[in-house]
Amino acid sequence: LKQPTFCEYNGFQAYGDANGLQVNKEVDLKNQLTIQYVANHEKPSIAKTIRFEPAHAAMRSIVLEHALAEQALCGIHFSRAHPSHIFSFSTKIGYTPMVIFRDNDITQPNHMLEAIRTMDEKGMRLVDNFKKTFPDLYDTIDQVEFKSNINTSDITKIWSIAAVFIGLYEGDDALESCEKLESTAIEFSGKSGPRIDYKVISTEEGYQLDPRLAIRSAMSFKLAGLDDYLLSFGFIDSLADFIAQQTENADANIGIHGVTLSGGIFENRQLLMRAYNGLSVNYPIYRNKRLSIDDANVALGAITLGSE
């Protein structure tokens, strides 16, 4: 790097200059002036900064680790606490968003109930039927309020709310609820789960994942009598299928040479292995080996953005 650059991201600091790159919990800058990078969703502490998309930085760190310069890639970045993103990259076009994940007003289970009820007539009938069939569970969904760890990514929110709808969790910690769904899914010993609807809708910002459809499909399966283990696994298995489909879309658009996987959601071994099974037949898969798959990789990748 020609100019000294610095980034602090979720407890990790990265610094780079003409002598190389380093990342750690704390980097000694020795009061020198640096170009500072700040994630798009964060508030800068100084006036002049360069804003960046964490998903792009995560991919950039993988590119550096695996020497993938000038390769066209599909990036899958699923963080637990920070914005997730599916996108493609090529040297000719740059970074192109494919599916965006935006924080929305559906942060509580009862918010989701109302959102599904007001979608359309089918949604209203589904909620009414759910209430008649599972009156106690319906009351629980209506009363549960997440108070801890509510600032999570959209995928984490979906899984957290799903655990309540399935009947796995009645507490107030969103992350704990998400982990309950994951631990239940691990106990499923079958090969495939029900098709949970991870679908995108067109918005002014681009194609965006609609969380209502995922929970709505789970409600239908619950009414059909699927057990908790199978239904929980469906959320993991169907997300892996969604990843594979988006990768094929990226390949059709720009002709990718591989896929990068990053973000804390991929600490879920079940999801990671299902994703590998769906992708590895057609595409090389790359992820961080020397860096953590979230946070540290983002900090290091950020300071090299712009040098692609």
Task: Give residue spans per PLM region.
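Acidic, glycine-enriched active-site microenvironments
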Residues: 1-308
